[in-house]
């Protein structure tokens, strides 16, 4: 059996889950998250915990995956997910335009407007160099953070650009001039 798949998922108070066909819907205080449930995997509520079971050994690969996705949904609707980004470089900054757009100035000839998808919120600090992305869907939060980082990935020589908070970067040594 999958070691991750056989762990039960604790359901906190105020969280309900519902399976209709091949869609799992988890509702909680922060909102609702829906996930696709592959065939051959079933969810059941036992002693206040969600238990994931599979039909046979051929579904072993997705057993742990389904458990992890449902667990992420339960944590998302109770605590939420956050991802922090840092913007490093002279003149590089981000600012919020309205509620649904982040405007980046990243050394290009034009500012870049990034529209936030529904269910995702962003906050910019006072210095405009740190960005916090929050939401209830872990996949969406990670995808938005990755797309923002891809606007100007860290440069290997000066480490300027958009990076995840706490990300360790290797700095390359530049060319040595002819003497």
Swiss-Prot record:
Question: Which Gene Ontology terms describe the biological processes this protein takes part in?
Answer: cytoplasmic translation
Sorted alphabetically, the Gene Ontology cellular component annotations on this record are: cytosolic large ribosomal subunit
What is the protein name for this chain?
Large ribosomal subunit protein uL6
Q: What does this protein do?
A: This protein binds to the 23S rRNA, and is important in its secondary structure. It is located near the subunit interface in the base of the L7/L12 stalk, and near the tRNA binding site of the peptidyltransferase center.
Q: Per the similarity annotation, which family is this?
A: Belongs to the universal ribosomal protein uL6 family.
Protein keywords? Ribonucleoprotein, Ribosomal protein, RNA-binding, rRNA-binding
- Which domain of life does the UniProt lineage start with? Bacteria
Q: Which Gene Ontology terms cover its molecular function?
A: rRNA binding; structural constituent of ribosome
Q: How does it assemble?
A: Part of the 50S ribosomal subunit.
Q: Which HAMAP family match?
A: Ribosomal_uL6_B
Q: Look up and give the organism this protein is from.
A: Koribacter versatilis (strain Ellin345)
Coiled-coil blocks: none
Primary gene name: rplF
